């Protein structure tokens, strides 16, 4: 009887190891599917974009069976915490605030932000540097923010909700602007084109992609933004306790960087090399 019981326990242990290994080789990745060209859907509803293709290559490098699932942006981090998926690849910038809740892999791409207006706007021709990094500070940054504060006074600026762009506008760095939030970037773009907002703030490539596909006269104005509230590049979001998965993603990202895959995909989807 004891031998039978030992055999039973051994079988249970073997099954536990088997299922643990199977789960370790299976990864579910959450993305929004509504932030082109980072992630989007084609006419058939298939997920496409820079991060969708990159995720597939990272999974090959990790020898993992991956599934990419959709999640609304404002529920992205809660969904990860609730274990609806194991990782986030959704144009999510690495910020100190987010790292209080989740971990991030090393960055795989830069995401510079920009203000956008419709052609003919009074905001065209803002006299600012081409780019500012809020982490470095200095007179150029201070002067640029001062110029923006004066120019944006009384203006309504559209942003996607729960983003670094909303956080920046509400930080007071550019005065007390009127911020209008939207569930998706597509809604921001549509209201900008319709003249229901004066300007919008998002990743520069989100506007250039929209302009190219819609034919609308969207114009980028002012400086591009990085650092500070805008974070330190885009990375894979992972739960705090998934330390091995974090190591696996970092190793795969290193491989993709060294063999040029990130650069290749960035040029394909963004039109320039945004790899980090």
Language-model features, listed with the residues they occupy:
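Bacterial N-terminal signal peptides
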Residues: 9-18
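Short helix-initiation/N-cap motifs at beta->coil->alpha
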Residues: 52, 67-78, 141-145, 179-194, ...
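A conserved helix-loop-strand patch within extracytoplasmic ligand-binding domains
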Residues: 64, 93, 104-157, 162
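Extracytoplasmic small-molecule ligand-binding "clamshell" domains
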Residues: 24-94, 100, 259
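A local structural motif
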Residues: 59-70, 151-156, 171-184, 196
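A ligand-binding cleft/hinge motif common to bilobed small-molecule-binding domains
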Residues: 75-78, 91-101, 167-172, 186, ...
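Periplasmic-binding protein-like
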Residues: 33, 110-114, 208, 212-251, 253-269, ...
């Amino acid at each position: 009887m004891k031998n039978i019981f030992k055999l039973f326990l051994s079988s249970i242990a073997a099954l536990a190891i088997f299922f643990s290994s199977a789960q370790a080789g299976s990864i579910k990745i959450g993305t929004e599917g509504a932030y082109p060209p980072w992630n989007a859907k084609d006419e058939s509803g298939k997920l496409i974009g820079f991060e969708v293709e990159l995720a597939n290559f990272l999974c090959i490098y990790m020898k993992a069976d991956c599934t990419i699932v959709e999640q609304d942006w404002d529920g992205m981090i809660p969904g990860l915490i609730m274990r609806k998926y194991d990782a986030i690849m959704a144009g999510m910038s690495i910020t100190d605030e987010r790292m209080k809740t989740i971990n991030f892999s090393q960055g795989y791409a830069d995401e510079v932000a920009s203000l956008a207006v419709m052609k003919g706007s009074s905001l065209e021709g803002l006299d600012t540097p081409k780019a500012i990094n809020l982490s470095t500070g200095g007179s150029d940054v201070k002067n640029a923010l001062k110029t923006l504060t004066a120019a944006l006074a009384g203006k309504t600026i559209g942003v996607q909700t729960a983003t670094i762009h909303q956080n920046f506008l509400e930080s007071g760095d550019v005065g007390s602007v009127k911020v209008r939030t939207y569930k998706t970037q597509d809604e921001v773009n549509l209201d900008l084109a319709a003249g229901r907002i004066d300007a919008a703030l998002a990743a520069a490539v989100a506007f250039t992609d929209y302009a190219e596909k819609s034919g609308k006269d969207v114009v980028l104005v002012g400086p591009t933004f990085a650092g500070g509230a805008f974070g330190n590049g885009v990375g894979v979001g992972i739960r705090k306790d998934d330390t091995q998965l974090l190591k696996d993603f970092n190793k795969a990202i290193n491989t993709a960087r060294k063999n040029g895959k990130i650069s290749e995909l960035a040029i394909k989807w963004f039109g320039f090399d945004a790899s980090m």
